[in-house]
Amino acid sequence: MEDLDALLSDLETTTSHMSRLGAPKERPPETLTPPPPYGHQPQTGSGESSGASGDKDHLYSTVCKPRSPKSVAPVAPPFSSSSGVLGNGLCELDRLLQELNATQFNITDEIMSQFPSSKMAEGEGKEDQSEDKSITTVPSSTFPAPSKPSATSATQELDRLMASLSDFRVQNHLPASGPPQPPAVSPTREGCPSPPGQTNKGSLDTMLGLLQSDLSRRGVPTQAKGLCGSCNKPIAGQVVTALGRAWHPEHFLCRGCSTTLGGSSFFEKDGAPFCPECYFERFSPRCGFCNQPIRHKMVTALGTHWHPEHFCCVSCGEPFGEEGFHEREGRPYCRRDFLQLFAPRCQGCQGPILDNYISALSALWHPDCFVCRECLAPFSGGSFFEHEGRPLCENHFHAQRGSLCATCGLPVTGRCVSALGRRFHPDHFTCTFCLRPLTKGSFQERASKPYCQPCFLKLFG
């Protein structure tokens, strides 16, 4: 830094002389001897001994330009005239430009040797190797002699030099997260570089180590939590633990539809995870009514499975109560509908017979329905008369057949007298006027009424 300050002050002095004196006359540039080579002076510093100024010393410790002895560059005697001062200023400016060029290339080489693009272990090894040997100087013959550099070109050279120094300062400050550590000495000898494969492998290992340490400082765990049950690779970061194994969250998938199951419920079948949809669709029993998978409660009846809301009467759709259900051809019915549809019918009321019944006339009857079909009177003594398939009492039976006595209205079961299209008991076939029996079989008829001969003549003469 002291040399750079000296260069800047000399340049300012030369510029001020040129501005005061005007345009000088042209003169051939003086042949100058090249500046002495720069030597590399390694500096071993310790974090404990370096204080607040240790960082600045460490920044610029690698480039040290020795001051040239006074005998090599003698001081020119002062000129009395303005042309002499101007010529001396141009010579001094040429010398400064040559020194700037040599310094720029040497500083650039030094920076690139210490901070390569990889910024990893390879760069550190090269820096350690550079401590054991001096930097190769660039001969002055390789650089063409500058032809009349102006103040503007010198300023541009200084700008490029300052930019290089700024990059050097930024790169040197980036990895400094703690106290400066002494550089590790590389065991490789000069002239025997390591193979590229080993260098790349070491750089990759160093990069992974730095990445893991950085994640650890940020609170992110980097230790492997086991092998993934799907890809069989180590797990670092988030992990899903299920089925006795660890999984990457993106690898814990449904075996059926391949959707991610992390953070959601799942079912296990034969050691494989399934989402609820795939599990119920593949392995749940089917409802006997809607043929859909049963997910929750289930009713088992008639050799199949049912949703509770679907196990109901197939006729009325009502759920079964405490009275249970009846089965017909594999289908459940409530008691009312089953009896209504399939119970035997009463011949009298055509209703289903639920309890006691009477079997008569090749049919079934409710006890209350087995009565005379004319007067609806129950049969006394359990006896009845049948006419045209209908149960009748005795009176209505004879009435239907015409075997009732026309006088008393009672059935004629024994001897009878048939006259006037009717039947009579023998004792009840009498004259309508005198009421004497007409036993002789001779009588007269008037208005469908029988009369004896004397009464008929007396009345109707």
UniProtKB/Swiss-Prot annotation:
<feature type="domain" description="LIM zinc-binding 4">
    <location>
        <begin position="404"/>
        <end position="461"/>
    </location>
</feature>
<feature type="region of interest" description="Disordered">
    <location>
        <begin position="1"/>
        <end position="86"/>
    </location>
</feature>
<feature type="compositionally biased region" description="Low complexity">
    <location>
        <begin position="69"/>
        <end position="83"/>
    </location>
</feature>
<keyword id="KW-0007">Acetylation</keyword>
<dbReference type="InterPro" id="IPR017305">
    <property type="entry name" value="Tgfb1i1/Leupaxin/TGFB1I1"/>
</dbReference>
<protein>
    <recommendedName>
        <fullName>Transforming growth factor beta-1-induced transcript 1 protein</fullName>
    </recommendedName>
</protein>
<feature type="short sequence motif" description="LD motif 2">
    <location>
        <begin position="92"/>
        <end position="104"/>
    </location>
</feature>
<keyword id="KW-0440">LIM domain</keyword>
<dbReference type="GO" id="GO:0005856">
    <property type="term" value="C:cytoskeleton"/>
</dbReference>
<dbReference type="GO" id="GO:0016331">
    <property type="term" value="P:morphogenesis of embryonic epithelium"/>
</dbReference>
<dbReference type="InterPro" id="IPR001781">
    <property type="entry name" value="Znf_LIM"/>
</dbReference>
<dbReference type="GO" id="GO:0046872">
    <property type="term" value="F:metal ion binding"/>
</dbReference>
<keyword id="KW-0597">Phosphoprotein</keyword>
<feature type="region of interest" description="Interaction with PTK2/FAK1">
    <location>
        <begin position="83"/>
        <end position="136"/>
    </location>
</feature>
<feature type="modified residue" description="Phosphotyrosine">
    <location>
        <position position="38"/>
    </location>
</feature>
<dbReference type="GO" id="GO:0016363">
    <property type="term" value="C:nuclear matrix"/>
</dbReference>
<keyword id="KW-0963">Cytoplasm</keyword>
<feature type="modified residue" description="Phosphothreonine">
    <location>
        <position position="407"/>
    </location>
</feature>
<feature type="modified residue" description="Phosphoserine">
    <location>
        <position position="68"/>
    </location>
</feature>
<keyword id="KW-0221">Differentiation</keyword>
<feature type="domain" description="LIM zinc-binding 3">
    <location>
        <begin position="344"/>
        <end position="403"/>
    </location>
</feature>
<keyword id="KW-0206">Cytoskeleton</keyword>
<dbReference type="GO" id="GO:0030855">
    <property type="term" value="P:epithelial cell differentiation"/>
</dbReference>
<dbReference type="InterPro" id="IPR050604">
    <property type="entry name" value="PDZ-LIM_domain"/>
</dbReference>
<feature type="short sequence motif" description="LD motif 1">
    <location>
        <begin position="3"/>
        <end position="15"/>
    </location>
</feature>
<feature type="modified residue" description="Phosphoserine">
    <location>
        <position position="164"/>
    </location>
</feature>
<dbReference type="GO" id="GO:0005737">
    <property type="term" value="C:cytoplasm"/>
</dbReference>
<dbReference type="GO" id="GO:0010718">
    <property type="term" value="P:positive regulation of epithelial to mesenchymal transition"/>
</dbReference>
<feature type="compositionally biased region" description="Basic and acidic residues">
    <location>
        <begin position="121"/>
        <end position="134"/>
    </location>
</feature>
<comment type="subunit">
    <text>Homooligomer. Interacts with PPARG. Interacts with TRAF4. Interacts with CRIP2. Interacts with HSPB1. Interacts with ILK. Interacts with LIMS1 and LIMS2. Interacts with NCK2. Interacts with NUDT16L1. Interacts with PAK. Interacts with PTPN12. Interacts with TCF3. Interacts with TCF7L2. Interacts with VCL. Interacts (via LD motif 3) with GIT1. Also interacts with GIT2. Forms a complex with ARHGEF7. Interacts with AR/androgen receptor in a ligand-dependent manner. Interacts with CSK. Interacts with PTK2/FAK1 and PTK2B/PYK2. Interacts with SLC6A3 and SLC6A4. Interacts with NR3C1.</text>
</comment>
<dbReference type="Pfam" id="PF03535">
    <property type="entry name" value="Paxillin"/>
</dbReference>
<feature type="region of interest" description="Transcription activation">
    <location>
        <begin position="1"/>
        <end position="200"/>
    </location>
</feature>
<feature type="modified residue" description="Phosphotyrosine; by FAK2 and FYN">
    <location>
        <position position="60"/>
    </location>
</feature>
<feature type="short sequence motif" description="LD motif 4">
    <location>
        <begin position="203"/>
        <end position="215"/>
    </location>
</feature>
<dbReference type="GO" id="GO:0045165">
    <property type="term" value="P:cell fate commitment"/>
</dbReference>
<feature type="modified residue" description="N-acetylmethionine">
    <location>
        <position position="1"/>
    </location>
</feature>
<feature type="domain" description="LIM zinc-binding 2">
    <location>
        <begin position="286"/>
        <end position="343"/>
    </location>
</feature>
<dbReference type="GO" id="GO:0045444">
    <property type="term" value="P:fat cell differentiation"/>
</dbReference>
<feature type="modified residue" description="Phosphoserine">
    <location>
        <position position="403"/>
    </location>
</feature>
<comment type="similarity">
    <text>Belongs to the paxillin family.</text>
</comment>
<dbReference type="Pfam" id="PF00412">
    <property type="entry name" value="LIM"/>
</dbReference>
<feature type="modified residue" description="Phosphoserine">
    <location>
        <position position="141"/>
    </location>
</feature>
